[in-house]
Amino acid sequence: MPIGYIRHKGIRKNDSPIYSHLSKTDYATGCCICMRSNDFIEIGMFDDSFPMYCEDVDLSLRFKEIGKKIFYVPDSKVWHKVSYSIGGEFSINKWKIKQLAKFKLINKHSNSLIMILMFPLLVLLSLIELMLNSLMRWFR
């Protein structure tokens, strides 16, 4: 996770055959993650310092550190009301909490030099995301 790029597999894409096959993925989102309880305990469970956002990425990174693999299972069925508890998908509150969590995640899983070098880019990307979120709210 050296550059801080976090993305769901197939997010905001139309369903297609490429998502119909079991495949490896970099992380599992918290709303649909499933793992053995002994593995969950071995990696230290969820890090409570991530109250919302990136806790699942952190968990997935630690899971992979012990040599485990993460798979996307297309036959699973999950219904998740995205961002409902935080004011909606494009809320400013969500953006703030998400940005703080991303910086915390990168700080936890990257070395200091990478964090220092990447910080200006991360701030720029965060501001672009804020502008896009504002536009999405405007055009809803």
Can you annotate each of these PLM segments?
Residues 26, 32, 51, 70-71:
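A residue-level structural signature of the nucleotidyltransferase/glycosyltransferase Rossmann-like core
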Residues 45-46, 68:
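Helix N-cap/coil-helix junction residues
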Residues 40-41, 51, 79:
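Nucleotide phosphate-binding site architecture
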